């Protein structure tokens, strides 16, 4: 379900490599070769994908797209003592306790707080319906940080989760409407977000839809 975002991230790396194919270290020029492996957005396969990269004797890891798979692979990189740099993975657990994992993006506690303040100050929300994928570290973590910040601001949050590979969000959107929510917060993958937006429009739901960095 994170395939589209993962492809965008890889394309960005490939573009950067095409623009700057070499690096100078200690007065010597080295060619930079990219090795790409696919973890298929699976926490289980993330570990084998990480091991695959290590077997290729890579010098550094970039990624992965998706917090859950990054958390799953982090110990593998630490044990191999290979540095990893997260580009878009925002869950704090990825780098916590791991001296070999770094990141160039912001964290979910920051993102959740900013989004909650936006809902309160700009959208004038008093009640927010939060919807994310069940068992997804990114969705669940960010909804939790959002909820904490929102409640401190005096907002009420209704939180629900949908199963993986769900394609019908009608009942969830109906619940949001019946609960009297002012805003829907859905920090989901791109593929789910598209379905939620389309089905909300089809149901005539015109409340603001708030999303995250994905």
What are these regions (language model features)?
Residues 65, 89, 132, 188, ...:
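Short secondary-structure boundary segments
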Residues 101-164, 182-183:
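An alpha-beta-alpha
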Residues 19, 23, 52, 117-122, ...:
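A generic secondary-structure signal
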């Amino acid at each position: 379900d994170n395939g589209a975002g993962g492809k965008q991230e890889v394309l960005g790396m490939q573009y950067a490599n095409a623009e700057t194919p070499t690096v100078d270290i200690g007065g010597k020029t080295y060619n930079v070769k990219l090795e790409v492996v696919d973890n298929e957005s699976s926490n289980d396969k993330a570990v084998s994908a990480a091991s695959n990269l290590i077997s290729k004797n890579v010098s550094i890891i970039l990624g992965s797209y998706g917090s859950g798979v990054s958390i799953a692979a982090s110990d593998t990189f630490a044990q191999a003592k290979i540095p990893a740099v997260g580009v878009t993975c925002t869950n704090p657990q990825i780098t916590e306790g791991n001296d070999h994992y770094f990141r160039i993006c912001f964290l979910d506690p920051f993102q959740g707080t900013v989004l909650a303040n936006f809902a309160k100050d700009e959208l004038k929300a008093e009640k927010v319906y939060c919807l994310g994928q069940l068992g997804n570290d990114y969705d669940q973590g960010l909804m939790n940080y959002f909820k904490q910040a929102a409640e401190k601001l005096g907002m009420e949050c209704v939180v629900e989760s949908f199963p993986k590979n769900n394609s019908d969000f009608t009942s969830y959107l109906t619940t949001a409407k019946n609960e009297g929510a002012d805003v829907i917060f859905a920090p989901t993958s791109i593929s789910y977000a598209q379905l939620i937006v389309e089905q909300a429009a089809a149901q005539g739901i015109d409340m603001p839809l708030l999303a995250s960095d994905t």
